[in-house]
């Protein structure tokens, strides 16, 4: 998407299909606040945009590209394991966009795969019963884009409630500007931040 107007049209289209602001934010890789801002047509007024859209379609269209990114993520995980002397039992992918990367990392590292689906209304999410369980596992959490960190925080909380231990979060792109969440280290392949502006 090349313009704010196009983002607005896409957000409105998704809203008209019944998606919540949170679901739209996940689909468009924007914060919930930015989606609310777009849908309220605040962008028509003077003012600076307070978010960065991150699109990775060029990576996602081919499995070979996803596995290339997963190799980098696996290398980061091994680096953290060695640096901080911890072991990993399982790789957790946050639905939807964290799952392809987590699947490939799980394969490359020969670790169990856990799939987590966050609840769009910020309630407790759930772990898919078709994949590995959480209890007693040391877990690396993988997602594509972290805007505010709320989804990661909820995932860490839910992992803990289920008897697991989150030992690391690995993100394709982070807008957060933090090195840990709830005491769990966060590593990202890319970090974004807005500089300057009005």
From Swiss-Prot:
CDD domains (alphabetical): PRTases_typeI (cd06223)
Domain of life: Archaea
InterPro entries the UniProt entry points to: GfcR-like, PRibTrfase_dom, PRTase-like
GO annotation, biological process: pyrimidine nucleobase biosynthetic process; regulation of gene expression; UMP biosynthetic process
Record GO terms (molecular function): DNA binding; orotate phosphoribosyltransferase activity
Record bears the keyword DNA-binding: yes
Keywords: DNA-binding, Transcription, Transcription regulation
HAMAP family reported in the protein's UniProt record: GfcR
Protein family: Belongs to the purine/pyrimidine phosphoribosyltransferase family. GfcR subfamily.
PANTHER family cross-referenced by the UniProt entry: OROTATE PHOSPHORIBOSYLTRANSFERASE, PYRE-LIKE PROTEIN
Domain remark from Swiss-Prot or TrEMBL: Contains an N-terminal DNA-binding winged helix-turn-helix domain and a C-terminal regulatory domain (or effector binding domain) resembling phosphoribosyltransferase (PRT) domain.
Name this protein carries in UniProt: Transcriptional regulator GfcR
Organism: Thermoplasma volcanium (strain ATCC 51530 / DSM 4299 / JCM 9571 / NBRC 15438 / GSS1)
Taxonomic placement: Archaea, Methanobacteriati, Thermoplasmatota, Thermoplasmata, Thermoplasmatales
